[in-house]
């Protein structure tokens, strides 16, 4: 179902390693329905990780296809996700969603039909749905929540010595994405547009963002693939070795970790922009664009850091904040110039960080090839 083009699933490309993709997947079930045999088109070191990813979870066909709104008036699939828009749908996990107040809360109840139900200890799980860091933190302090994974940025320093505050590594990258179809690049050659993006990158003081916003030991990203990613052969992917050495060997990346204002100016000049003797962008060739982010104190703080960095040479960047759903929809639709983004690995293989950049990927927010 997820591989079916009619479903238009964001993660449909995850099935492309299965023989017969996308029209006739070579997957068969045993007579007792308890075993699946999957034939791969090529060796895949991370396939078992894929099998544990939500896109590969089993769903009940009757539940999906009988949902109100699933089919349009002409009989074609209108909304493939209609079956899971409200609480009470059939699922196969340890818990079932029994109550859902949209944008407010969710309640999950132990599923007695789960295959390992006897080892599921908690009867209910209650979730608070909010994008407000301050409200989430207040709910934790008042005892309404037992666990949270976000706190207001201005609370981080005071929490570093708190035994309840845990810093956990993530295999992921926080980044800024450019809409390649944006008017920002109108009239520019492919090379000039690339020079503009590289120039903006050289102006951003990543270490300052880590020290003042992140505050928990994040590392500068000099490549999109993060440190610690497996190479599929028992080693680490991001390394200098006999097969490949990064252009900036010391930073293990494609550019250095330091701000390079002079280099940025030279790149912008090559893209057709003029500068005065003081190194400020000429009024004759202005650069002005909008930065899209969701309403979260940390994301907004990072946007403000970038805004200040670019302003140092006269680039005008305005910040547009919006709620989570609007933010996701606008970014996916390409209704932005530059947007904050982030990707935490779904499984430990570099391909997970790379497949999202293809034209037909559901996560192609930068609009490559569109």
Located regions from the model:
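Surface-exposed binding/hinge segments that line
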Residues: 2-71
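Aromatic- and charge-enriched surface segment that lines or borders ligand/interaction sites
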Residues: 1-7, 37, 136-139, 190-192, ...
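Append "and occasionally in soluble cytosolic enzymes with long acidic Gly/Pro-rich linkers
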Residues: 192-308
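Short, well-ordered beta-strand elements
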Residues: 36-38, 93-96, 106-107, 123-128, ...
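A bilobed periplasmic-binding-protein/Venus flytrap-type ligand-binding module shared by bacterial periplasmic
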Residues: 109-113, 171-199, 212
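Extracytoplasmic/peripheral linker and loop segments enriched in polar/acidic and small residues
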Residues: 20, 27-29, 198, 210, ...
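Gly/Pro-rich hinge or "lid" segments in bacterial periplasmic/extracellular proteins
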Residues: 22, 44, 52-120, 124, ...
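Ligand-site clamp/hinge motif
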Residues: 100, 111-158, 316-318
């Amino acid at each position: 179902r997820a591989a079916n083009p009619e479903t238009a699933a964001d993660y449909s490309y995850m099935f492309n390693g299965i023989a017969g993709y996308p029209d006739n997947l070579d997957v068969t079930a045993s007579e007792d329905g308890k075993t699946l045999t999957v034939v791969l088109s090529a060796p895949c070191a991370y396939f078992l990780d894929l099998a544990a990813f939500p896109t590969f979870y089993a769903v009940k066909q009757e539940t999906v296809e009988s949902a109100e709104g699933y089919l349009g008036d002409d009989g074609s699939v209108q909304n493939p996700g209609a079956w899971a828009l409200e609480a009470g749908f059939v699922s196969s996990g340890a818990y079932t969603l029994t109550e859902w107040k949209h944008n407010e809360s969710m309640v999950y109840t132990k599923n007695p039909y789960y295959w390992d139900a006897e080892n599921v200890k908690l009867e209910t799980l209650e979730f608070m749905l909010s994008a407000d860091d301050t409200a989430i933190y207040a709910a934790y302090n008042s005892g309404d929540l037992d666990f949270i994974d976000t706190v207001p940025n201005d609370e981080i320093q005071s929490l570093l010595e708190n035994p309840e505050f845990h810093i956990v590594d993530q295999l992921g990258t926080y980044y800024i994405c450019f809409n390649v179809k944006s008017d920002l690049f109108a009239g520019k050659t492919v090379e000039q547009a690339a020079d503009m993006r590289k120039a903006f990158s050289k102006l951003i003081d990543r270490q300052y963002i880590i020290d003042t916003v992140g505050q928990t030991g994040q590392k500068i990203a000099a490549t999109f693939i993060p440190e610690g990613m497996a190479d599929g052969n028992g080693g680490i992917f991001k390394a200098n070795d006999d097969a490949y050495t990064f252009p900036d060997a010391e930073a293990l990346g494609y550019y250095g970790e330091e701000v390079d204002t002079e280099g940025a100016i030279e790149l912008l000049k090559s893209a057709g922009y003029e500068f005065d003797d003081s190194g400020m962008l000429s009024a004759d060739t202005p650069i002005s664009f909008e930065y899209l982010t969701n309403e979260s104190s940390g994301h907004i703080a990072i946007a403000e850091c970038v805004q200040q960095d670019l302003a140092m040479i006269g680039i005008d960047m305005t910040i547009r904040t919006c709620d989570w759903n609007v933010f996701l929809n606008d970014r996916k639709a390409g209704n932005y110039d530059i947007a904050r983004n982030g990707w935490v690995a779904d499984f430990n293989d570099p391909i997970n960080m790379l497949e999202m950049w293809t034209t037909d990927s559901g996560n192609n927010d930068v609009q490559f090839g569109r």
